[in-house]
């Protein structure tokens, strides 16, 4: 049983990237599915699908690589807000990751958004992770 499903997801993606795996399997929750949606919209993964039923639902994420060297599109992932120390930011304090080259994933009242979309909509929320 994993307490922090977001950290588990980020770790699985990081390890699969380092091993140059094409597909990574993560447990499916509402939050991991929303984060996968953001990764897909921002072009960090090719696609994802939900398989299984009931308590055994899994997300299959197709990772994206570039060039003949198969360099990962995702350079790094960093968990920010965690169960032991929640991190919140209002719309004025939303972080910029690497000066705009990366994204911050924010959980807002209107769902999980990137920092740019949250800033555009004037929303703050919990800063889940950074991806670049």
From Swiss-Prot:
GO terms for molecular function: rRNA binding; structural constituent of ribosome. InterPro entries: Ribosomal_uS8, Ribosomal_uS8_CS, Ribosomal_uS8_sf. It comes from the Eukaryota. Disulfide bonds: none annotated. It is found in: Plastid, Chloroplast. One of its GO terms (biological process) is translation. Pfam families: Ribosomal_S8. GO terms for cellular component: chloroplast; ribonucleoprotein complex; ribosome. Keywords: Chloroplast, Plastid, Ribonucleoprotein, Ribosomal protein, RNA-binding, rRNA-binding. HAMAP family: Ribosomal_uS8_B. Part of the 30S ribosomal subunit. Belongs to the universal ribosomal protein uS8 family. One of the primary rRNA binding proteins, it binds directly to 16S rRNA central domain where it helps coordinate assembly of the platform of the 30S subunit. This is Small ribosomal subunit protein uS8c. It comes from Rhodomonas salina (Cryptomonas salina).
């Amino acid at each position: 049983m994993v307490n922090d499903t977001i950290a588990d997801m980020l770790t699985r993606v990081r390890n699969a990237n380092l091993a140059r795996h094409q597909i990574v399997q993560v447990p499916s929750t509402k939050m991991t599915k929303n984060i996968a949606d953001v990764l897909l919209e921002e072009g960090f993964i090719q696609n994802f699908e939900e398989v299984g039923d009931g308590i055994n639902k899994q997300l299959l994420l197709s990772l994206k690589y570039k060039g003949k060297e198969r360099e990962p599109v995702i350079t790094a992932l960093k968990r920010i807000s965690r169960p032991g120390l929640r991190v919140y930011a209002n719309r004025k304090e939303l972080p910029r990751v690497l000066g705009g080259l990366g994204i911050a994933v924010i959980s807002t009242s209107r769902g999980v958004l990137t920092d740019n979309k949250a800033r555009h909509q004037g929303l703050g929320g919990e800063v889940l992770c950074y991806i670049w």
